[in-house]
Each structure stands twice: as structure tokens, then as C-alpha cells.
């Protein structure tokens, strides 16, 4: 009798899990500019595929996330319907709301390692303005072209044609960038765990021109291999070498160099802008050599991220970043570790910790204070691409630890070769056009504490 009851209760569940649906049609609307093939090649299924019933919702969720991660759409809706001609067939309906793709480039950059450090110094001269244009989704193919002129703290230019997909499956992607930067200020050493700058009055401290080409192979939608080759010509003032003879490894004021980088990424996060579930594995090999082969440098860098929902409101995540480098000469420019790029410790925004090897670990507990809201801004009725806005707010608590090893540290850098820790609480505001605003109240083991601010993915 018990066996019969168990079979009676669970047989429908088993039969449902074994049911298969065939994708008979894929309908797309809302893509006024974006080509349909750009959308279909990001889907984890294609017309004619068979999907198990118990896997269907997860597959549709992945399709939605893949399309949002293109950064081409503010909203994506993926729905299913039973084909009227056959109950085992499904029609997939995809409705997208495109972003604005053509931007006059008016970009204000606060020239510091982070916004909090710039606010502390309040140096109005440390601002660079970019003026030009940037076009996303060129020809509806998700290509990006940009041209800009820099003035202010840095002067220079940038020309780029990037994200050029080759083939129907977007398995091969190319990018080209030409870049020039001319600055009268340069960070030439770290003292007391803070970057020290030399400001030249009459001449440029650093003049840099570079050209790079990168190629990406995507064997899967969320897995990529990238190779980048860069040629660079740099001229520095002799003052830099007088202030720090070990600035870049030799006594030349002019250098031509080649860089070769390889990057592997497996990005299984649900949403690239503000992930809450999934993981990221990133590994990077960097190689650098000047053209007379007297200065050589290599680095292995890794980044592991993991995101886990604990409930509808609570999430936990962890970020582990590490790097190990080798070089044949002592050079300050190759020793930048904690406080640069993605190796950060919240609460140490005002400090850097140089070294040849480093590791940082950043676990965070998050709580969804305000679920995602969608509002229509009627006063922007003349700008339909900006009128509909979404936003959500998360509270968070965090505890960071890190360590950087320096083989020949400056005696003034009191954080060298020490385990560091910090903690705090904060708020994150996430909204459209990939805008993330963060306010943290952090403290560190130096008994310092305060508010810190950051802005990611600015609108322009």
C-alpha cells in the first residue's frame, strides 16, 4: 500500500521531468537596430533543439541573462508558449528594449586610483576630460567604434574599433586600438604606502604612444580565450630617473616595447553588472620586453569570484585575486600590487602596497533592501531610450584580507610584507546603463575609518 502511494504521488513529477519540448520557432521583436543574429547567437538553444521540461525555466533564464550581458538592452523579456499545432512544441518570444547607442563622448575622469582618494586630495588639476564620440552596436552587429581627444591632467587621444565579430556564431572577435597620452605628472615611487608624483612645469614627464590588436576565441558563449599584442613607444623626462633610478629598469629615457598577453575567462555569473549567482574564473599571463631585450617582465594573475543566493533577500559572494611576477631588473613600474586594478582592500583606498606577489580575498554578505523597481520618467518623454528606468538597492557587510610580498621594500612602506585586514558596511545602488553607485563605511587595522565612494560604468 505504501509503495502504491509513493508511486501515485511522485509519478507525475517523474513523468514531467522526462517530458521534452522542441523549440519550433524563435520570435524576436524590439530590435530596431540590433541584427537578429546578434541575439540568436547568445541563446543557449536554437530552433529545432529539444529541452527537458524540468530544465526549461533555467535555460530561459540563462537566455535572458546572456542578452542583458551584451549591454545592448535595458530590458529583456523571454517567454514561452505552446505551439498551437503541436503541444510538444514551444515557441520562444523574445522582446527587447534597446539602449541609446550613439554618444557624444564627454567623459570626466578623476585621475586617481579611486574616487575616494581623489575626494581626499581635492586636487582640481587631477581631472582629465575626454571629448569625442563613441558608437556602440555599429551596424547592429555589436561593434564599437570610438575617437576621443584628452585634455586637462592628461593630454592625448584614443582611436578604437573593437568587438568586431567574425562569423555567424561570434566565435572569433577582433579589436584594434591606437592610443596616445602626454602627462606633466608621473607617479615615480611609493613612500609611506602612498604614490608620490612629480609635476613638471615646462615639459611632459611622460609621452606615450601605443597600438594594440586583440583576438578573442569563444568556444562557448561564456568561455573565451584572448590574445593581445601591443607595441608601445614611451619617452620620460630625465627628472624621473634622477628621482628614482629604478623607475623602469634602466637609464634610458626612450623605450620601445612589446607586450603579449593571454587571458582565459569562464564567466558563469548571472549578471555581469551586479552578479548574485554563479562564478567567474579568470587567468592572465602577461609578458613584456623592450626591443633591445634588456628589460623583461612576466606576470601570472588570477581572479576567482563566487556568488551564492541564500534566500530571496540574502546573498553571499567572495572574490579572490592573486598575482606572481618575475623580472630581470628592479623596476618600480612592475611592482604595483594591492591598490591597483582589481586587487583592492576596502578601507585601504588611501594606500598602495607594492610587491612581486600578492593575494586579496573579499567576502561580502548582501541583503536586498529594495527589490528591482521600474519607473517611467514622464519628463523624459522626448527621450524614449532614457524614459524607462530600473533600479535596486542592496545593503552589505564585508571583511577583506590581503598580503603583498616585496623582496626589496622601501623602509618607509610600513604595510609591506604584512597581512592586512579591513571590514565595514555599505549600500549599492544599481540602475540602467550599467551604472553602479557604492557608499561604504570601512575601517582597517590602522584604526582608521570613514566613508568611501565609488562609481562604476559611468553613463558616457
Question: Model-flagged regions — what are they?
Answer:
Residues 257-388:
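C-terminal outer-membrane beta-barrel translocator/porin domains of Gram-negative envelope proteins
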Residues 19-175, 251-276, 357, 404-410, ...:
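Outer-membrane beta-barrel initiation region
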Residues 313, 364, 368-372, 380-423:
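Outer-membrane beta-barrel transmembrane domain signature
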Residues 97-261, 266-269, 337-343, 348-359, ...:
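Gram-negative/organellar outer-membrane beta-barrel architecture
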Residues 1-22:
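Bacterial Sec-dependent N-terminal signal peptides
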Residues 179-183, 232-234, 284-290, 323-327, ...:
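Short glycine-rich beta-strand segments
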Residues 246-248, 256, 333-344, 403-415, ...:
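Solvent-exposed, glycine/polar-rich loop segments of beta-barrel outer-membrane systems
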Residues 36, 331, 371-377, 388-392, ...:
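Extended hydrophobic-aromatic, low-complexity segments
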